Amino acid sequence: MTLLALGINHKTAPVALRERVAFSPETLDQALGSLLAHPLVQGGVVLSTCNRTELYLSVEQQADLQEALVRWLCDYHQLEPDEVRQSLYWHLGDEAVSHLMRVASGLDSLVLGEPQILGQVKKAFAESRRGHGLSVDLERWFQKSFSVAKRVRTETEIGSHAVSVAFAACTLARQIFESLADVTVLLVGAGETIELVARHLREHKVKRLLIANRTPERAQRLAEDVGADVINLAEIDSQLGEADIIITSTASTLPIIGKGMVERALKQRRYQPMLLVDIAVPRDIEPEVAKLADAYLYTVDDLQAIIEKNLAQRKHAAVLAETIVAQESMDFMGWLRSQSAVEAIRDYRTQADSLREEFEARALAALRLGADPEQVVKDMAYKLTNRLIHTPTKSLQQAAREGDAERLQILRDGLGLDTH
């Protein structure tokens, strides 16, 4: 049995190919069933995200294994092997083990250290478990990878520094305001970036969230998801003074918030400070706002500088994370190799127990017939010794006859002959 990882990702294939190789949630059960029906596959997990599609398998090692699995993948997606072969990567044994650990830890992600991938790996694992697709070794491999990912998060700062604009904006807000529990935030826009900001803020239990957008329907959908209130763009002027933090990201070609609007808001707030984060290009907030004493304006360029610094810190943390993965991968492979001896140890124990029962029964029978107890013990010890050394003696003699010094030494080590 061999552990294997096969797949494509953002580093090896363009999005056009990744789309064609992806497994949709609706077809995942069917795909898993088809994969598990393959004669070489003992267990499998299918991981399919926007950035990667990977098969994690326990398989019977054969000469044509790679070609057989590539053929299955291509047949399932109605692709020609030559269309995907150059983009596929293939990891066996310890390379497969460390690859999954790196993926789960965010070390192989498009955004270094991003935490979402761990949840996606756990979901893929759960899907396989529901479909009875897990072999013992495969389950142990994934559980170990989850614990490694947790250790990486705990012992390094791989996820501590914002490397997306949305996360950086929220991190900045948390740094300036000690707690968001007493803060009102106004979000202007309802696109993907603002949606990510809104979800980050909800996780940090912001006191009140307002969303203003040119299209009220889109703002309303987002507001329902994150527990926010919706206002019209025209209401920003009157509502601005309520907000401690304003984060904007629209497609407007002209500024939405001007210096005069912020001056009025500050007066309404009795000049309590305001944080304004403009992550739009072109800018949503007039640059002159930065000249106001109690208004702290940050642009996307300011956030980019934060992101670059944080990415450097993540890369530094990744060095330690890679060390953890290497160590844990080696430990897991040691455990995996030890499993190959489990059956032999079990058989050896059964044989020893059978031998003990045989000689014990003979001794008890002799005692019941009135034999001398001392002689019974001596006979049992002599015969048991001869039986125990018979097979090892033959193996030692054969190794010596064949001049196999390595095997002879292995036998000596196994029998404990060189311990004194």
UniProtKB/Swiss-Prot annotation:
Site keyed Important for activity: positions: H99
Reaction(s) the record says it catalyses: (S)-4-amino-5-oxopentanoate + tRNA(Glu) + NADP(+) = L-glutamyl-tRNA(Glu) + NADPH + H(+)
InterPro entries on file: 4pyrrol_synth_GluRdtase, 4pyrrol_synth_GluRdtase_dimer, 4pyrrol_synth_GluRdtase_N, GluRdtase_CS, GluRdtase_dimer_dom_sf, GluRdtase_N_sf, NAD(P)-bd_dom_sf, Shikm_DH/Glu-tRNA_Rdtase
Coiled coil spans: none
Keyword terms, alphabetized: NADP, Oxidoreductase, Porphyrin biosynthesis
CDD domains according to UniProt: NAD_bind_Glutamyl_tRNA_reduct
Record-annotated active site: C50
Any GO MF annotation of the entry: NADP binding
Catalytic activity, EC: 1.2.1.70
Similarity-based family: Belongs to the glutamyl-tRNA reductase family.
Recorded domain comment: Possesses an unusual extended V-shaped dimeric structure with each monomer consisting of three distinct domains arranged along a curved 'spinal' alpha-helix. The N-terminal catalytic domain specifically recognizes the glutamate moiety of the substrate. The second domain is the NADPH-binding domain, and the third C-terminal domain is responsible for dimerization.
Other comment: During catalysis, the active site Cys acts as a nucleophile attacking the alpha-carbonyl group of tRNA-bound glutamate with the formation of a thioester intermediate between enzyme and glutamate, and the concomitant release of tRNA(Glu). The thioester intermediate is finally reduced by direct hydride transfer from NADPH, to form the product GSA.
Name of this protein: Glutamyl-tRNA reductase
Gene that produces this protein: hemA
